[in-house]
């Protein structure tokens, strides 16, 4: 039985996943020997295929797809208790490919294959939301509303511009949400404008039973293992995938014109952290409670929840990476 498995999302790469498949298959077979190819056709097919690969004794799993397909594979290997045992090789064929950049993998298939052939293995942190794993980021509010507005057909036609189109569509009806955020005080690491005056009683954060607590209204939030979302939007510029922390970005309620300007700063490369209405900190675990169920996008997977419990699993996954991930 082949010792490696290739899981392919045929709708990735503007529906060009199958076009890349012969070259990918030949290159991987030359380097790693015979392997079975599994084509996904529906939600969580990648998860089932990855779990089956672990049960079949595979020692490598390759993923040809985007961040959503990768998320399914991570969850499948975690369910099979094989996440720290079987390395994942990512061939980034999606629209955003945000996590591939953290692994220093090219979006050009031939170059990515050359990097994977080096078999440089790295340990990578994994985040969880309500027990389900994510590898790149989990975001709610405006972020997830945009994701819901951007379907596969729009991504196939417009590529990364789809997220801008979706954002313009969502802006008209978007509303902020009341939120209660709490985390252990000993794992609170402020990184931007969390100065003493913002942590004072009644001015933001407060201490309550050994926990840091914040009650506010949010336009959006992102809990990040990696730096980027939405095809290169630098939401968490200080995040690393191997530091044992989640980087958290909370965007407080503000006038809509100000919010539009802030989104432009995110797109421009991380200057949003200079806005005092942005809270940026690190945490190992985090609880969020909302006045109503909010849409949450976790590596492309959408759900609605009024309670979100996050934690990090340090070094829980193994990946094949490019030549230099020192800044990832």
Stretches found by the model and what they are:
Residues 1-64, 71:
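ATP/NTP phosphate-donor binding region
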Residues 18-20, 74-77, 101-103, 148, ...:
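Short amphipathic alpha-helical segments
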Residues 31, 40, 55, 78-197, ...:
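Catalytic core of DAGKc-family lipid kinases
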Residues 46, 68-73, 98-99, 124:
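Short glycine/serine/threonine-rich phosphate/pyrophosphate-binding segments
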Residues 139, 143, 222-237, 302:
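Glycine-rich phosphate/pyrophosphate-binding beta-alpha loops
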Residues 208-209, 215, 234, 240-246, ...:
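ATP/nucleoside-binding phosphotransfer catalytic cores, i.e., glycine-rich phosphate-binding loops
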